[in-house]
Amino acid sequence: MADEIADDEPKPLGRCSVFTYGVGHMLNDITSACWYTYLLLYLTDIGLSPSNAATVTLTGQFADALTTIIAGELIDRFGHFKIWHGMGCLLVALSFTSLFGGCLPCKILGSDSPAVKTVGYCISAVIFCSGWSCTQISHMSMVNGVTLNPTSRVACVSCRNAFTMIASLILYAVAFFVFNKKTSSSQVDIKNQYQMMAYISIFIGAVFVIIFQLGTKEPSLKQESDGKRATATWTYWFKKVLYYQVLSIYVLTRVATNVSQTFLAVYVINDLRMSPSSKALIPATIYLSSFIASVLLQELKWSGERLKAFFSAGGLLWLFCGAAVIFLPINMNAFMYVLSVLIGIANALMMVTAIGMESELVDKHLDGSAFVYGSLGFLDKVLCGVFLYFLESYESADPVACDPAYPCFSVTRFSLGFVPGISALIGVVIAFFIKFHTSHPKPLTEPLLA
């Protein structure tokens, strides 16, 4: 009898299947790391005011959010995850060089006025973020169709998160090489640096897109007798308390990671007065520690209770790091490397478990998976966009005068320390009250990134 029950349980995935799925978000990840880490610096370096730079970011975030909902609904109705994924990757690749390589409308109109620049970069941001969301939603919502085994689903998410870290490390290695080349501080040279970084990033990401497209099978989802796709209604999810709990945790996790990533480079340069290379080394340290944590996480046996426990550990660790960021003085800036390791671990714990909770929410309801991922992504992007707009609008493009022995309470410190820390704390409180259906961890048959 025990053998019959075991045979009925979904079989875990093998190493190759997890790998080919996990690399499918690499192009999104490497370009996203550049967007959140360097866009604010880049736009202000080429002459845009902080408020105009914030407008570009907000425009992209809202385009991302809107496309997330539309793509999620269409994927649920018609399927074809891999087609949506490929289409999104194409838009990302085409728009990324324009975003970080110069203002195309400025060249067409022959004008470098702030208004034309802002509109030009907003157009590139809209195309980039729309393509990015198509890739993201199609890739995330595939995981429940790729496997129904709860532990394998978390392993896929953990593998994806590990390659997110690899993508970011690659970007920061490229950035370290680009930013350490001796060039003048003219806008032309600055644009050339970022354009070189954009071309290299797109090439590397495209290689992994090909691996994903060739190695991952299109999930076969159920259909009605008339051949149409069966989809769960929106009201089905809106009636579930678990939906709102998971939504809150996922959105708060994204706020913590995205806001902190956006202000990190400005913080180490303007607030801690560290060397220019630190804007690549500090983020690289964060992603390296996050990568190691993600690899270790995928070897664990997972259940709903463990998802809650590990998320809470990550949230409390972020709370400690946020407090340290706020009170760190200039003469102790070397301690930022220690904080970077802790932030990376906290990010991995929160992100892997938050997405794992999404999979637990969807469970076997594959017919509505894209809506769940899309709706959560929509709120995440709207909220992050609003946060970033207001925070960046009050950001100073120049370092403020500060006593090296005492912390300067700037907008950057508030954005990097307080906002992620409080978001993580609220997420921990919500996680305490969540109840999942799965209570017993199901083991894997083999290690997945050994």
Where do the model's predicted regions map?
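Membrane-embedded alpha-helical bundles of multi-pass transporters/translocases
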Residues: 2-450
